[in-house]
Every structure is written in C-alpha cells, then in structure tokens.
C-alpha cells in the first residue's frame, strides 16, 4: 500500500516544468516573491551595475537576500518569470501588460486620465501569475522578443510583487482592474480566455466601472493557499487610498513608502482613528544595508507597524492620485510583514 500512496503524494506535489508561475532566484517555481530594486546611489558595487542591484525574498527564504545577479538579467526572478511572454510558443497564453507610463517602444502614450497603476497578468487555462510593480516603461511588449530592464528605471528604488494563482482567481483580478482603470499597452485575450474573463476583456477595451461603489476589495488565494487581499479604487473615489480607505479596512496604523518628489504630497495624517505616517528613510538589515531616503525610492508599499499587514502596490500619496484609479495587494504572511517592518528607519511625524 505504501507505493500507491507515495505515487499519489508525488502527483499532488509535482509542478510541471513549464507551468506558468512566478519563478524565484533559484530558478524554480515559487508561490510568491518580492523584488526590491535598490536606488543607484545606495550601497556599494561596480559602477556598471549601479541601479541594477536588488534584494529578494520568497516563501522559502529567511528574510531579505541579495539578488543572484542584476535586475536586467533574464536568469533572475523577474526575467525568468516573464520569459514565457517573449517565447514563440505563446499561442496558448493570455496576457495583459499595463502601465500609466508605457514603454517607448509601444504605441501607447502616457495618460494621466487612466489609473496610476502598473502590472502584468500572464496565464493559461490552468493559471498563471499577477506581477504588481512600480516600474515605469516596463516590461517591453511581447513583440520585442526578449526581456529587458528600461534604462530610465535604474536611478530610483522599485518594488515588484509576484503571486502565482490558479485560473479561478483571475475573474476577481479582472473585476479589480475595472476599478483601477489601467492603460493596457499590450495584450492577448482570445477565445476561451475572453469568454471566461469578461471583465478583463472590458479592461482591454478601455472600459471601467460606471457606478458606485467606487472602490472594491477581493480576496485572492495563491496556488499554494496563501491569502492576499486586493484593494482597488476608481478615480471617482476621490480620496487617498491609504488614509481614506486602507487603514480603516485593515484596522491598523500604516507606515507608507511612496514617491515624494511629485507636487501635492499628502502629509502624514493623524486626524482619524488610525495614523498614516509617510516613510522618509528605508534601510535593509546588516552592516552593508543599504539605507536610503524616500526621495531616492519610487517603490510603493505600506506596513502596519504593530502587524500583521503588509501591502505592495502602485499608488502614491498626493492630491492628483486621490482622483485616479489604482490599488495595492496586501497579505498577512508573517515573514513578509517582518521583512518590510524592518525596513522603516524614519517617518515624518504628524
């Protein structure tokens, strides 16, 4: 009886080599990963690689680790994950690439009327992944044929969160994107995908939610059973994502890292039940750090100082973005919360 049981267990644990999934720095499929691209002026390193170094973690790592190479390598986590997008045998795949600052190689133009939101969906009929990120001009369209890192994205810090998901979770993501109103600059959603994912098809046509409520949250379950919660708002929501909704929804104070170099920055807010503090300095653990100011960091994330929530997304805290779509993806994974909580070195008081 032992042999059949062993075979059954192996079948349940086996992941096909070509399964669409987030891929880690190890070169193997992972349930989720976070890549934190470091600012060019932080830490040490040879000049040619300035702005291409990154920190990495997934469900198997013990906190932050140095990236295995450089962010522009096709052999690192981000390059491996996006590789199927650029392969010729992608006829059975569906994908959406969206960015309010699309690559120059695409025909799309920057649009302040669309959501301030950036991401990648890549899937087949079994599932795929959602990559939520902060990187302008990224990634290059599928027709480019190869993964690359945009030169404009070397200077400042950036975050990328990838989650592997079964197909059943993509209708929920489609709903969320009708709220965030993304600028889709490249996509393929044909046949069975268009039939089963009608909201995503509407998104590719530039459609969005037409009636209240102007915000939406959806629970998503990763391929390995990790729970994430997506928060999305349309422009007519008319308020800051963090102080106007997220803190109350999560029931916690928040420390928020965002791009502070744009006009109309919203100050730290202690007027409500929960405090929203703007992060001013970020530092990685260890003697080499590095530590850097928020003015050098284009990433968008927040953490509950007392736990257990951490969120990675694509929205800043400024007046303009109170009237734009966007969102964030949150989780209560203890290791991920601990990793981000340790990054906060200073906040602007109320």
Swiss-Prot record:
- Tell me the active site: 298
| Signal peptide stretch | 1-19
Q: What class of enzyme is it?
A: hydrolase
Q: Which GO terms describe its cellular component?
A: lysosome
- What are the glycosylated positions? 89, 215, 269, 293
| Reaction(s) catalysed by this chain's protein | Endonucleolytic cleavage to nucleoside 3'-phosphates and 3'-phosphooligonucleotide end-products
Kindly state which keywords UniProt assigns to this record, in alphabetical order. Answer: Apoptosis, Developmental protein, Disulfide bond, Endonuclease, Glycoprotein, Hydrolase, Lysosome, Nuclease, Signal
Tissue pattern of expression reads: Ubiquitous.
Q: Which domain of life is it from?
A: Eukaryota
Q: What is its EC number?
A: 3.1.22.1
Q: Name one GO molecular function term.
A: DNA endonuclease activity
The text of the family note is: Belongs to the DNase II family.
Q: What does this protein do?
A: Hydrolyzes DNA under acidic conditions with a preference for double-stranded DNA. Plays a major role in the clearance of nucleic acids generated through apoptosis, hence preventing autoinflammation. Necessary for proper fetal development and for definitive erythropoiesis in fetal liver and bone marrow, where it degrades nuclear DNA expelled from erythroid precursor cells.
What this protein is called in its record is: Deoxyribonuclease-2-alpha
Q: Which gene encodes it?
A: Dnase2
């Amino acid at each position: 009886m032992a042999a059949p049981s062993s075979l059954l267990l192996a079948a349940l644990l086996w992941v096909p080599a070509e399964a669409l999934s987030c891929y880690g720095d190890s070169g193997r499929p992972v349930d989720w990963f976070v890549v934190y691209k470091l600012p060019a002026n932080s830490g040490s390193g040879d000049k040619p690689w300035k702005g291409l170094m990154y920190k990495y973690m997934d469900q198997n790592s013990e906190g932050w680790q140095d990236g295995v190479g450089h962010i522009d390598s096709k052999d690192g986590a981000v390059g491996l994950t996006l590789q199927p997008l650029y392969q010729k045998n992608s006829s059975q795949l569906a994908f959406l690439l969206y960015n309010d600052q699309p690559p120059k190689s695409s025909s799309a133009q920057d649009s302040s009327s669309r959501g301030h939101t950036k991401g990648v969906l890549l899937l087949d009929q079994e599932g795929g992944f959602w990559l939520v990120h902060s990187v302008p001009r990224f990634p290059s369209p599928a027709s480019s044929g190869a993964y690359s890192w945009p030169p404009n994205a070397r200077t400042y810090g950036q975050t990328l969160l990838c989650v592997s998901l079964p197909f059943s979770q993509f209708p929920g993501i489609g709903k969320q994107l009708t709220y965030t109103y993304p600028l889709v600059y490249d996509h393929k959603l044909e046949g069975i995908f268009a039939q089963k994912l009608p909201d995503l098809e509407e998104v590719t046509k530039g459609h969005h939610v037409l009636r209240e409520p102007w915000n939406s949250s959806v629970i998503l379950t990763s391929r390995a059973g990790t729970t994430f919660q997506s928060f999305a708002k349309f422009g007519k929501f008319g308020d800051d994502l963090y102080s106007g909704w997220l803190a109350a929804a999560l029931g916690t104070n928040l420390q928020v890292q965002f791009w502070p170099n744009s006009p109309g920055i919203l100050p730290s807010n202690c007027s409500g039940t929960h405090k929203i503090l703007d992060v001013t300095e970020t530092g990685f653990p260890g003697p080499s750090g590095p530590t850097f100011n928020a003015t050098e960091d284009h990433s968008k994330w927040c953490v509950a100082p007392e736990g257990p929530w951490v969120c990675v997304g694509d929205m800043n805290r400024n007046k303009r973005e109170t009237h734009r779509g966007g969102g964030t993806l949150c989780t209560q994974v203890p290791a991920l919360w601990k990793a981000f909580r340790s990054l906060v070195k200073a906040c602007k008081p109320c």
